[in-house]
Amino acid sequence: MPIGVPKVPYRIPGDEEATWVDLYNVMYRERTLFLGQEIRCEITNHITGLMVYLSIEDGISDIFLFINSPGGWLISGMAIFDTMQTVTPDIYTICLGIAASMASFILLGGEPAKRIAFPHARIMLHQPASAYYRARTPEFLLEVEELHKVREMITRVYALRTGKPFWVVSEDMERDVFMSADEAKAYGLVDIVGDEMIDKHCDTDPVWFPEMFKDW
C-alpha cells in the first residue's frame, strides 16, 4: 500500500522539541532538491520556484539537485537549465539512477566541477523530438523549423559545456546514446564519478555537503 510522503523528526531553530514534518520539506531546508520524475510543467515550476526562493534566502550557499529522471518536455527542461544559470548560488547536479534526454541537459547545467554521477548511474542524450508530428502539413513545417532552431541551440550548449566539437555532439545526438558514469565523465557531461569525493569533502569541509548526508 502507498505510505505517502515519509515524515522525519526536525527541530526548527529556536524550538526545544522536534516535530514530524514531510521528508522533502526537511530536504528543502537543507537546500537539497529532487528531480525524480518526468519533466513536466508542474515539477518545473516547483523546482524553479524553490531555486529562486533559496537564492533570495541565501545567495552564497550551494544548492544540491539530485536527478533520477527519464527526461520530458523540452521547454520545461530548458526553463530549469536557465534558472540554474541565473540564480547566484552554485548548483551541484547529482545523477543517481538515470538522467536521460532533457534530464541529461539539466545534469550538464550544474556548476563546472560540481556535476556528479553515482557509479551505477546511466546518462542518455539524443536529439529533441516534436510532439506535433501528426499536425497538418503547414503546421508541421513550422514546427520542424522551430525544432531545428532549438536542436542547434541545445547542441551548442552541449558542445560548449563538454568541450566537444559541435559536429561531434550533433552526430551523437542523431541516436540515443547511453553512457555509464565513467563514459559521461570522459565525454564531459559530469566532473566526478562516485561518492568518494563527497566523503572526502564531508570529512574536510563540513559546509560542502548537507549535514544529513555525512553518514551515508
From Swiss-Prot:
Catalytic activity of the protein: Hydrolysis of proteins to small peptides in the presence of ATP and magnesium. alpha-casein is the usual test substrate. In the absence of ATP, only oligopeptides shorter than five residues are hydrolyzed (such as succinyl-Leu-Tyr-|-NHMec, and Leu-Tyr-Leu-|-Tyr-Trp, in which cleavage of the -Tyr-|-Leu- and -Tyr-|-Trp bonds also occurs)
EC number per UniProt: 3.4.21.92
Subcellular location: Plastid, Chloroplast stroma
Record-level Gene Ontology MF annotations: ATP-dependent peptidase activity; serine-type endopeptidase activity
List of catalytic residues: S101 (nucleophile), H126
Pfam families registered for this protein in UniProt: CLP_protease
Superkingdom assignment: Eukaryota
GO terms under biological process: proteolysis
Keywords (A to Z) from UniProt: Chloroplast, Hydrolase, Plastid, Protease, Serine protease
Listed InterPro entries: ClpP (IPR001907), ClpP/crotonase-like_dom_sf (IPR029045), ClpP/TepA (IPR023562), ClpP_His_AS (IPR033135), ClpP_Ser_AS (IPR018215)
Assembly and binders: Component of the chloroplastic Clp protease core complex.
UniProt family annotation: Belongs to the peptidase S14 family.
Protein role: Cleaves peptides in various proteins in a process that requires ATP hydrolysis. Has a chymotrypsin-like activity. Plays a major role in the degradation of misfolded proteins.
Protein name per the record: ATP-dependent Clp protease proteolytic subunit
